[in-house]
């Protein structure tokens, strides 16, 4: 009961008209991946776009707060590196290859440029701590001037509160 009240106060649902575009079509969770196509990779996003599916992608913060498209908090599963992505500088993450030759970990700006409004994109901000401001600001800046349909979500209610208090 108290948790739901806090969620409602910190992260109220958006007006239905603002998110209506999210309904009525399939979404590829982390892009359309599998059988030689790695999740949250440019190839997974291109496969989803080809089928007209919207895209859900995950965003993590580098040490400096910049937004990278990567699901896991740790690098181990999808790269040959170990440890948390949040402990690395953007310049270092730019050099990390995804496993099996799937390119580098993309920055959110690169993914938005690739999608280029061809399908809607749902950006999930992943944050395990209370310091969400730098990552939220990075996402907002990446979305400035983006011509396509996009929405931001998070399971951390502080993210929704940040966007409510700091503009859309």
Regions found by a protein language model. Name each.
Residues 1-168:
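Phosphate-group recognition and catalysis centered on beta-loop-alpha active-site segments
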